[in-house]
Amino acid sequence: MKRKIVSAVLLLCISIVVWAQEPILKLRYEENYTPTYYEVIEMYRLLDEHYENAKLTESGMTDIGKPLHTFIINSEPEFDVQKIKAQGKSVLLINNGIHPGEPEGIDASLQFADDILRDKNGMRKWLDNTVIVIIPVYNVGGHLNRSAYNRANQATPYETGFRGNAKNLDLNRDFTKCDSKNALSFNRIFQQWDPDVFLDTHTTNGSDHQYSITWITPFPDYFPPTQEEFLRKQMIPDIFEKMDAGEYKLTPYVNWIFHDPAAGILLWQDAPRYSSGFASLFNSYGMMTENHVYKHFPDRVKSCYQFITTLADFTSENSTEIIASRRQGTEEMLAMKNYPLTYEVDTTQYTTFTFEGYETSTEVIDKVTGLPRFGYDRSKPYSKEIRYYYSYNTVEEIKIPEYYILPQAWTKVIERLKLNGVIYRTLEEDQILEVEVDYIDEYDSAKRPYNGHYFHNNISTHKEVQEIQYYAGDLLIPVRQEKMKYLLEMLEPKAMDSFFRWNFFDSVLDQREYFSPYGFEENALKYLNDHPEFKKEFEAKRAADQEFAKDHRAQLAYIYDNTEWAEKTFKRYPVARIY
């Protein structure tokens, strides 16, 4: 009798083990179907209920009024980030659905979560060294705006969400300016988890080729020497090698030079407005996958899944080195004297690789218009050695200040600094400080709004040292802190995605006081008589410049702009430096 009971118990245990290995989720990407927002969240809720080492949490709000979720997968039922970090585990953060018309990552991450939790092919061992955090759908509003007509260049899946969010923002331009609640929530999530590796999943239709998936690698030149070396010698080549051993080969993102990949492609430089560029501000290894829109949806999902599993494997296998490289990178960053602001590709530095593409022609006859166009001939695939330009040179760099001073009036900037964990102190009393300031000499603004802003380009400045009145409560920000790159990229006006470029300081570009020629005449005359050296300079300009000599207002303006009457705050950038 006892033997029968034991046998029954063993049989029950075996049945449970076998049952536990079965997938929980029923995904339908093979049918060219991607789940709705509610279906996605329900699937993660099922995994949460089934596995004690997985947890679905609400991690902030989105513009559509629905929460932004994170799904945490650990080796044990521990979800406190500080306790996890104390165990020495690396963190892999995966973001999906930023452009819901590009849903491969949504399906692939669901498949990955289901498989790693049921330990398919021994995947669960990766959790020994790495905790995985998944954002199921980032652009919730866009994913709810579902239609069969949101992606004109994309045949499958049959219905997808929309690129814009509830405020019609492209959220992959919003990570630093944070116009959306989505981005504010993401910034909090990112600072909470401080991911060692970050992946954002996308789809591209920029070119046609034989690959189902392309990769925007971390931009090595953004990183301190130890991390740059780790990227170039280990992470990037290892992931390419692991991917090429699988069903779906990987190619660098096809950032072409002359419209045809055969002419060579460039390493993509991702600005901080993009998720991967934002990650690099904190020395996190940020990257994007770009699935190829013209491939069948099932292949896009499976190739994205292959990349996610490859990345999880690499992150776990190299967890200790990844964490150590970031720590060393921070030390190297804090020792820097100068900081690069702008880059250009180094055309002398390239490697070659075999690219699998299609022959191109500028004489393809359009079936609708009957006119010639550029196109690819899929009946003529090729494998060619092409150049890959992988290195950039610094064009402009700045001396790193010891402190920034930011007046408390600029609350929107301060909110974003706080959100990203910037350390600062406030002045305890009113005081005059000698500081270096920038004056904005020239800039171009977009003629039409770009993601809700009139972005500034072609900025030129000059520096002055001035004594400026500051007040109790103004911010004194030490630059040499863990958030140094974020500070430099956001507060230096000429940095590629600075707060200045995104119009946070535009009110300083307006002049508040003016002169009336009639009212200013007597004051101008008295000033010239009281300042003979300036009078000589003024008369010399009038003698040398005939147009100036004929222009009544221009002459008075010259006196106004070059004397004590001029507004010192006009075009004076509010963030000052102390060295």
Name each model-derived stretch.
Residues 2, 20-579:
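Structured catalytic-domain cores with a bias toward divalent-metal coordination
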Residues 7-17:
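Bacterial N-terminal signal peptides
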